[in-house]
């Protein structure tokens, strides 16, 4: 595992371990959910440090140089991309994530089933997410997303997306807490940590399971970074 972690953060730099042996185990553990379980265990390890008062959703498109599964052309990036939507707590720890989404879809594509799966997984781990603010930008502001949040006991805190609306919305004004929304910057900080892992900046993995497995390693390292730093001081 140490060799795989070093490979994804720094690239191959030493010749002591065969790259084919490292990739063999990485491929195996990506497909049998071992890396996903590693990430889940990292969440349970830091459970007492998590802050569930606010959850933050955001996404980032990754250029895919060699194509592969769930890869499609994205005009804004001017290339083939894929997307992933992690969910962080108020401190920026990654506690849930969607799977890989093709880059030709907007951020709200199939958002309802993605959120339902993420919320159910967090509840299965015993994470007390009920009552939390759910921060997301206007790209995720859909009726289904808000309804899903309410159904799972969360408070949707999204800037209103006025697309396709020709007149002012009637009825009660939507709940929106601007002070809470401003604190979602921690999600951007988390993406900066993810970008430190070279294998995630540009996608070379053709299989979704492998690219997602690389993310699980990064998520685990980010969640445990303060524990590892204290251990090796």
What are the language-model segments listed below?
Residues 1-233:
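Short alpha-helical elements
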